[in-house]
């Protein structure tokens, strides 16, 4: 069982490493999104550089990476505690942030982390998504909405009584905020781009 978990974790990392924004940009738009906007491989920069259609596709793909990776033990009928689903999900987040297929320069882990939560705790995903969308509607900042959504997920997770989930969501929230430190500076300086499509 230990070997199987290790293999599934490695597979989850590979799945997380799929650079959706980079590949869609290069294949369909002849653009390397690392050379435009924030230079980030995530969904937000895909929206900014490639447009709403491509950005939406990248977002869905990045969420699915987290969801599929989290469900790997289920797909392979591995008889383990559900907490191990979070292990494979965590490896997908690592893969997305430090992708094997993109020089270990990845996204900020928001969408893929959301996919992990969607697979493990769907109601928590919905609650965090509502907070994200409300914040986005008010502020027009994707970065700020992502951070507040992550913090909301952490707060709500405390009411679920699953300490393994709480620990993972706490790590996700801290990591998301850390990955957005440049965005925080730009928000303070009034230089952070606002979305125009919502």
UniProtKB/Swiss-Prot annotation:
User: Does this entry carry the keyword Transport?
Assistant: no
Identify the keywords attached in UniProt to this record, alphabetized: Cell membrane, Lipid biosynthesis, Lipid metabolism, Membrane, Phospholipid biosynthesis, Phospholipid metabolism, Transferase, Transmembrane, Transmembrane helix
Tell me the compartments it is located in: Cell membrane
Q: Part of which pathway?
A: Lipid metabolism; phospholipid metabolism
Disulfide bonds listed in the record: none
| EC numbers | 2.3.1.275
- Membrane-crossing segments per the record: 5-25, 56-76, 84-104, 114-134, 158-178
* InterPro entries in UniProt: G3P_acylTferase_PlsY
Q: Name one GO cellular component term.
A: plasma membrane
Which GO terms of the molecular function aspect are on file?
Answer: acyl-phosphate glycerol-3-phosphate acyltransferase activity
Q: Which GO terms describe its biological process?
A: phospholipid biosynthetic process
Establish whether keyword Transcription regulation is in the entry. no
Membrane topology recorded in Swiss-Prot or TrEMBL: Multi-pass membrane protein
Chemical reaction(s) catalysed: an acyl phosphate + sn-glycerol 3-phosphate = a 1-acyl-sn-glycero-3-phosphate + phosphate
What function is annotated for this protein?
A: Catalyzes the transfer of an acyl group from acyl-phosphate (acyl-PO(4)) to glycerol-3-phosphate (G3P) to form lysophosphatidic acid (LPA). This enzyme utilizes acyl-phosphate as fatty acyl donor, but not acyl-CoA or acyl-ACP.
UniProt subunit comment: Probably interacts with PlsX.
Q: Which family does it belong to?
A: Belongs to the PlsY family.
Could you tell me what this protein is called?
Glycerol-3-phosphate acyltransferase
Origin species: Listeria innocua serovar 6a (strain ATCC BAA-680 / CLIP 11262)
Q: Give the organism's phylogenetic lineage.
A: Bacteria, Bacillati, Bacillota, Bacilli, Bacillales
């Amino acid at each position: 069982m230990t070997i199987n978990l290790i293999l599934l974790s490695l597979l989850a990392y590979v799945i997380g490493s799929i650079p959706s924004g980079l590949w869609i940009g290069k294949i369909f738009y002849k653009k390397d999104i690392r050379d435009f906007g924030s230079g980030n491989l995530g969904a937000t920069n895909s929206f900014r550089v490639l447009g709403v259609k491509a950005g939406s596709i990248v977002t869905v793909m990045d969420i699915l990476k987290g969801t599929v990776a989290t469900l790997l033990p289920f797909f392979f009928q591995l008889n383990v505690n559900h907490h191990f689903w979070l292990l494979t999900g965590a490896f997908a987040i690592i893969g997305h942030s430090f992708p094997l297929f993109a020089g270990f320069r990845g996204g900020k882990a928001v969408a893929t982390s959301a996919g992990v939560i969607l697979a493990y705790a769907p109601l928590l995903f919905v609650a965090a998504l509502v907070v994200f969308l409300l914040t986005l509607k008010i502020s027009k900042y994707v970065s700020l909405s992502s951070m507040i959504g992550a913090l909301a997920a952490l707060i709500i997770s405390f009411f679920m009584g699953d300490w393994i989930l709480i620990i993972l969501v706490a790590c996700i929230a801290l990591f998301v905020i850390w990955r957005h430190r440049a965005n925080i500076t730009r928000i303070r300086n009034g230089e952070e781009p606002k979305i125009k499509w919502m």
